[in-house]
Protein backbone atom coordinates (compact mmCIF):
# COMPACT_ATOMS: atom_id res chain seq x y z
CA UNK A 1 0.00 0.00 0.00
CA UNK A 2 1.37 3.41 -0.96
CA UNK A 3 1.98 5.98 1.73
CA UNK A 4 -0.34 8.95 1.90
CA UNK A 5 1.09 12.20 0.58
CA UNK A 6 0.72 13.60 4.12
CA UNK A 7 3.08 10.93 5.50
CA UNK A 8 5.50 11.53 2.62
CA UNK A 9 5.43 15.28 3.36
CA UNK A 10 6.08 14.69 7.06
CA UNK A 11 9.00 12.39 6.28
CA UNK A 12 10.38 14.95 3.82
CA UNK A 13 10.15 17.69 6.48
CA UNK A 14 12.27 15.54 8.82
CA UNK A 15 14.81 14.97 6.02
CA UNK A 16 14.96 18.73 5.32
CA UNK A 17 15.55 19.54 9.00
CA UNK A 18 18.25 16.87 9.18
CA UNK A 19 19.95 18.35 6.10
CA UNK A 20 19.75 21.83 7.64
CA UNK A 21 21.33 20.61 10.87
CA UNK A 22 24.14 18.94 8.93
CA UNK A 23 25.01 22.06 6.93
CA UNK A 24 24.82 24.31 9.98
CA UNK A 25 27.22 21.91 11.67
CA UNK A 26 29.68 22.36 8.82
CA UNK A 27 29.86 26.10 9.53
CA UNK A 28 32.30 25.48 12.39
CA UNK A 29 34.64 23.60 10.05
CA UNK A 30 37.16 25.80 8.19
CA UNK A 31 35.56 27.19 5.03
CA UNK A 32 37.95 25.54 2.60
CA UNK A 33 36.73 22.16 3.89
CA UNK A 34 33.09 22.90 4.61
CA UNK A 35 32.17 23.47 0.95
CA UNK A 36 32.64 19.77 0.26
CA UNK A 37 30.82 18.76 3.45
CA UNK A 38 27.93 21.11 2.69
CA UNK A 39 27.61 19.84 -0.88
CA UNK A 40 27.66 16.23 0.35
CA UNK A 41 24.99 16.95 2.96
CA UNK A 42 22.75 18.61 0.39
CA UNK A 43 23.17 15.76 -2.09
CA UNK A 44 22.37 13.23 0.63
CA UNK A 45 19.40 15.39 1.65
CA UNK A 46 18.01 15.31 -1.89
CA UNK A 47 18.40 11.51 -1.90
CA UNK A 48 16.56 11.27 1.45
CA UNK A 49 13.74 13.54 0.30
CA UNK A 50 13.31 11.56 -2.92
CA UNK A 51 13.15 8.36 -0.88
CA UNK A 52 10.24 9.83 1.14
CA UNK A 53 8.25 9.86 -2.10
CA UNK A 54 9.44 6.43 -3.27
CA UNK A 55 12.19 7.70 -5.59
CA UNK A 56 15.50 5.86 -5.26
CA UNK A 57 18.50 8.01 -6.20
CA UNK A 58 22.22 7.50 -6.00
CA UNK A 59 24.32 10.19 -4.32
CA UNK A 60 25.45 11.35 -7.76
CA UNK A 61 21.84 11.68 -8.90
CA UNK A 62 21.00 13.55 -5.70
CA UNK A 63 23.81 15.99 -6.35
CA UNK A 64 22.55 16.48 -9.94
CA UNK A 65 19.16 17.49 -8.52
CA UNK A 66 20.82 19.95 -6.16
CA UNK A 67 22.75 21.47 -9.07
CA UNK A 68 19.55 21.67 -11.14
CA UNK A 69 17.72 23.47 -8.33
CA UNK A 70 20.59 25.91 -7.77
CA UNK A 71 20.99 26.62 -11.48
CA UNK A 72 17.24 27.24 -11.79
CA UNK A 73 17.91 30.16 -9.50
CA UNK A 74 20.10 32.05 -11.89
CA UNK A 75 23.66 33.26 -11.80
CA UNK A 76 23.01 36.38 -9.70
CA UNK A 77 21.61 34.36 -6.82
CA UNK A 78 24.34 31.77 -7.08
CA UNK A 79 27.01 34.49 -7.16
CA UNK A 80 25.51 36.17 -4.11
CA UNK A 81 25.67 32.94 -2.12
CA UNK A 82 29.19 32.08 -3.25
CA UNK A 83 30.19 35.63 -2.27
CA UNK A 84 28.66 35.09 1.16
CA UNK A 85 30.70 31.89 1.57
CA UNK A 86 33.89 33.72 0.54
CA UNK A 87 33.16 36.56 2.99
CA UNK A 88 32.62 33.99 5.75
CA UNK A 89 35.88 32.28 4.82
CA UNK A 90 37.79 35.57 4.95
CA UNK A 91 36.28 36.50 8.30
CA UNK A 92 37.04 33.06 9.74
CA UNK A 93 40.65 33.17 8.55
CA UNK A 94 41.42 36.27 10.61
CA UNK A 95 40.82 34.44 13.86
CA UNK A 96 39.24 37.55 15.33
CA UNK A 97 36.20 37.25 13.10
CA UNK A 98 35.88 33.47 13.33
CA UNK A 99 32.65 33.47 15.37
CA UNK A 100 31.04 36.11 13.15
CA UNK A 101 32.15 34.31 9.99
CA UNK A 102 30.89 30.97 11.26
CA UNK A 103 27.55 32.52 12.28
CA UNK A 104 27.14 34.16 8.86
CA UNK A 105 28.03 30.89 7.16
CA UNK A 106 25.60 28.94 9.36
CA UNK A 107 22.71 31.32 8.63
CA UNK A 108 23.33 31.34 4.88
CA UNK A 109 23.88 27.58 4.75
CA UNK A 110 20.68 26.92 6.70
CA UNK A 111 18.65 29.10 4.33
CA UNK A 112 20.29 27.45 1.32
CA UNK A 113 19.58 23.95 2.69
CA UNK A 114 15.97 24.91 3.44
CA UNK A 115 15.59 26.18 -0.14
CA UNK A 116 17.16 23.02 -1.61
CA UNK A 117 14.98 20.84 0.61
CA UNK A 118 11.78 22.75 -0.16
CA UNK A 119 12.48 22.61 -3.88
CA UNK A 120 13.27 18.88 -3.76
CA UNK A 121 10.10 18.26 -1.74
CA UNK A 122 7.95 20.13 -4.29
CA UNK A 123 9.64 18.33 -7.19
CA UNK A 124 9.25 14.82 -5.77
CA UNK A 125 5.76 15.55 -4.38
CA UNK A 126 4.56 16.55 -7.84
CA UNK A 127 6.03 13.36 -9.27
CA UNK A 128 4.42 11.28 -6.49
CA UNK A 129 1.02 12.81 -7.24
CA UNK A 130 1.43 12.14 -10.96
CA UNK A 131 1.44 15.81 -11.89
CA UNK A 132 3.49 17.34 -14.67
CA UNK A 133 7.12 18.15 -13.94
CA UNK A 134 7.82 21.58 -12.54
CA UNK A 135 9.44 23.98 -14.99
CA UNK A 136 12.82 25.58 -14.39
CA UNK A 137 11.01 28.85 -13.65
CA UNK A 138 8.69 27.18 -11.12
CA UNK A 139 11.65 25.48 -9.42
CA UNK A 140 13.47 28.81 -9.29
CA UNK A 141 10.48 30.55 -7.72
CA UNK A 142 10.08 27.81 -5.08
CA UNK A 143 13.80 28.04 -4.31
CA UNK A 144 13.83 31.87 -4.02
CA UNK A 145 10.71 31.98 -1.86
CA UNK A 146 11.99 29.28 0.51
CA UNK A 147 15.41 30.94 0.76
CA UNK A 148 13.87 34.35 1.58
CA UNK A 149 11.52 32.86 4.16
CA UNK A 150 14.32 31.05 5.98
CA UNK A 151 16.77 33.96 5.71
CA UNK A 152 14.18 36.29 7.29
CA UNK A 153 13.60 34.06 10.33
Question: Each predicted region: which residue ranges?
Answer:
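Terminal, membrane-proximal amphipathic helices
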Residues: 1-26, 43-73, 88-90, 100-153
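A generic short alpha-helical patch detector that favors 3-5-residue windows
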Residues: 13, 37-41, 78
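Conserved phosphate/anionic-ligand binding catalytic regions in large, soluble enzymes, centered on
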Residues: 22-38
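A generic, lipid-embedded transmembrane alpha helix
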Residues: 72-85
Amino acid sequence: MAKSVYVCDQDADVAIKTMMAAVVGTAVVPAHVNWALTASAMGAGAVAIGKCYGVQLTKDEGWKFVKQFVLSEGMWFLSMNVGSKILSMLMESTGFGYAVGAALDAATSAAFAWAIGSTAKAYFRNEYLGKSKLTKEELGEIFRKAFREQKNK
